[in-house]
Amino acid sequence: MRIGLYPGTFDPVTNGHLDIIGRAVKLVDKLVIGVAVNIGKGPLFTLEERVATLERETAHLTKIAQIEVRPFDTLLMYFAREVGAQMIVRGLRAVADFEYEFQMTAMNQQLDREIETVFLMADPRHQAIASRLVKEIAALGGDVHKFVPPGVAEQLLAKLAK
């Protein structure tokens, strides 16, 4: 069984994330979506909310491949081994992403040479989307419906209204 791992903070999940997930499921028999605890980023949504949102937003893709959404709070390569992943899937939006991902991949290869990293280029419609910017736009009263699924937009607006 080919198992892929798509890790991220997903705070919130964006249309860009979902595009990568939708393409990644076609490459594997099972895709594990690893939701990083990542306390350092100070997430707006709780870990439980992010996991539940991803489960809801990816439910329709289970016809293509098995999907499992799991939180993790360890080194990525340790988590990849734990779930039996042969590949890590990463999305690239711009040159800055490539530089960061190149360095991370080089370090990850030192930890486990058996796990490959596969890069998927972001769809041009989603190249500018970043969770950080979506939160900023929403906080300043902007419309985020073109950047995130409708349910996520509503969650985001409700969270910021508190």
Curated annotation (Swiss-Prot):
Belongs to the bacterial CoaD family. GO terms for molecular function: ATP binding; pantetheine-phosphate adenylyltransferase activity. Keywords: ATP-binding, Coenzyme A biosynthesis, Cytoplasm, Magnesium, Nucleotide-binding, Nucleotidyltransferase, Transferase. ATP binds at residues 9-10, 17, 91-93, 101, 126-132. NCBIfam families: coaD_prev_kdtB, cyt_tran_rel. The gene is coaD. Reversibly transfers an adenylyl group from ATP to 4'-phosphopantetheine, yielding dephospho-CoA (dPCoA) and pyrophosphate. This is Phosphopantetheine adenylyltransferase. GO terms for biological process: coenzyme A biosynthetic process. It comes from Caulobacter sp. (strain K31). InterPro entries: Cyt_trans-like, PPAT, Rossmann-like_a/b/a_fold. It is found in: Cytoplasm. SUPFAM superfamilies: Nucleotidylyl transferase. Substrate binds at residues 9, 41, 76, 90. One of its GO terms (cellular component) is cytoplasm. Transmembrane segments: none annotated. Coiled coil: none annotated. Pathway: Cofactor biosynthesis; coenzyme A biosynthesis; CoA from (R)-pantothenate: step 4/5. Its EC number is 2.7.7.3.
